[in-house]
A protein has these predicted regions:
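Active-site phosphate-binding strand-loop segment of PLP-dependent enzymes
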Residues: 54, 58-113
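Conserved PLP-anchoring active-site segment centered on the Schiff-base-forming lysine
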Residues: 21-40
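Conserved Walker B
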Residues: 37, 87, 116-117
Length: 205
């Protein structure tokens, strides 16, 4: 409910989330188009998927448009997954999510946003940069880790029910990994409740 999606899937870590989610979405027939400064775990997830991996210049919307146009000209019906962080881990840049959403809609692509460094910090309820910019409902996959603002361990992806079912049945880093222990799951839920509460709002000021 915090992310405003139909469903969410939890993983043992943020890294496991990147691996499992991207490999569940894309395959050898698709292209993963990623911001050049995206986190290593996202790059590894794209490589594991077997999809073609391409990059666009960091936060450069003209570069993204040109790459999307080239991919659509080459394969009008090909699958494209655009990947970016919301707040970049190395330098703190914020992605221009409104522009990215417009472009992914224009070219019929899917969009994955890694909110690892936005979750718990940005937005009215701490849901992240997508919430702050009012574009959450237009992002196909919002993923992140619980090891930053939430202060625990684990990862998540928030998406449609249909895509969540795909991941539960195909994400190898989920299926073949031990689930978080009950104490950790309870701590994560408590942290999320603090983030979305009035106390969390005060702490973000």
């Amino acid at each position: 409910s915090l992310k405003g999606t139909e469903a969410a899937v939890s993983f043992s870590s943020g890294y496991a989330t990147s691996l499992g989610v991207i490999a569940s979405i894309a395959d050898r027939e698709d292209t993963v188009l990623m911001d050049k400064l995206s986190h290593a775990s996202l790059i590894d997830g794209a490589r594991l998927s077997g999809a073609r991996l391409s990059t666009f210049l960091h936060n450069d919307m003209e570069s993204l448009r040109k790459k999307l146009q080239h991919l659509r000209d080459a394969n009008p019906s090909g699958g494209i997954l655009v990947v970016t962080e919301s707040v970049f881990s190395m330098d703190g840049d914020r992605a221009p999510l409104r522009e990215i959403v417009r472009l992914k809609d224009e070219f019929g692509a899917l969009l994955l946003v890694d909110e690892a460094h936005g979750f718990g910090v940005l937005g009215e309820h701490g849901a992240g940069l997508a919430e702050e910019l009012g574009v959450s409902s237009r992002i196909d996959f919002q993923m992140g880790t619980l090891s930053k603002a939430a202060g625990v361990s684990g990862g998540y992806v928030a998406c449609s029910r249909a895509w969540a079912d795909v991941m539960v049945n195909s994400a190898r880093s989920l299926i073949y990994s031990t689930a978080p222990p009950p104490a950790l799951a309870a701590a994560a839920l408590a942290a999320v409740e603090v983030i979305r509460s009035g106390e969390g709002k005060e702490l973000r000021r």
